[in-house]
Amino acid sequence: MIKRFEIGVYNEVVRSTLRSNRDLPKSNKISPDYENVIYVQRWADSKEDALHKASFEFPKSKGFVIDYCEKIS
């Protein structure tokens, strides 16, 4: 049965750049909002499935960190 999960994600590159009082490069396509944890809701069969799907949407190779994942319904 498909369930709804809340996933918290931030971007380590954005976070470290902004917290060291540097400007994000103009080539950066990631919102500065990702300095903090952003919560999104996604549908998945299990927590593992939700994390797997989130890893494609928020790739580690681009600095994203999945900080939180919990079933909400």
Regions found by a protein language model. Give the residues of each.
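Short N-terminal "domain-start" leader segments
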Residues: 1-26
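Short, mixed-charge low-complexity intrinsically disordered segments
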Residues: 47-73
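Compositionally biased, intrinsically disordered low-complexity segments
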Residues: 12, 40-41, 69
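A short, exposed loop/beta-hairpin motif centered on an aromatic-Gly-Thr core
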Residues: 28-45
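Short, low-complexity, polar/charged sequence segments that are solvent-exposed and flexible
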Residues: 25-30, 59-63
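A generic structural signal for short, solvent-exposed coil/turn residues
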Residues: 1, 32-34, 58
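A short, structured loop/turn motif at beta-sheet edges
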Residues: 1-5, 43-48
